[in-house]
Amino acid sequence: MKTLLLTLVVVTIVCLDLGDSLICYMGPKTPRTCPPGENLCYTKTWCDAFCSIRGRRVDLGCAATCPTAKPGVDITCCSTDKCNPHPAHQSR
């Protein structure tokens, strides 16, 4: 009986731990599991001095809170697995 109870406890802990792991894109085709406590994916886009040549810069990643937008910087946040694909790789 104790073995069954211990097994159930271990299975419960493993299942709860897996449920908290969010997967976000860190690059155009690079999904990674976020560290504990970082439960949001973000996409940050902006223009720099070379925007007319190479287009908008893109930063993807995980965050505990949605980063604060600054003038000229667009940020979107989401909370489901792989919800922040690189804008160039989104299906149309």
From Swiss-Prot:
Keyword Kinase: no
GO cellular component terms given for this protein: extracellular region
Official protein name in the record: Long neurotoxin 77
Tissues with expression: Expressed by the venom gland.
Subcellular location: Secreted
Organism, as annotated: Drysdalia coronoides (White-lipped snake)
Claim: Signal is one of the keywords in the record: yes
Disulfide topology: 24-41, 34-62, 47-51, 66-77, 78-83
PROSITE patterns named in the record: SNAKE_TOXIN
Residues spanning the signal sequence: 1-21
Function (record text): Binds with high affinity to muscular (alpha-1/CHRNA1) and neuronal (alpha-7/CHRNA7) nicotinic acetylcholine receptor (nAChR) and inhibits acetylcholine from binding to the receptor, thereby impairing neuromuscular and neuronal transmission.
Recorded family membership: Belongs to the three-finger toxin family. Long-chain subfamily. Type II alpha-neurotoxin sub-subfamily.
InterPro entries in the record: Snake_3FTx (IPR003571), Snake_toxin-like_sf (IPR045860), Snake_toxin_con_site (IPR018354), Toxin_cobra-type (IPR054131)
Chief location category: secreted
Keywords: Acetylcholine receptor inhibiting toxin, Disulfide bond, Ion channel impairing toxin, Neurotoxin, Postsynaptic neurotoxin, Secreted, Signal, Toxin
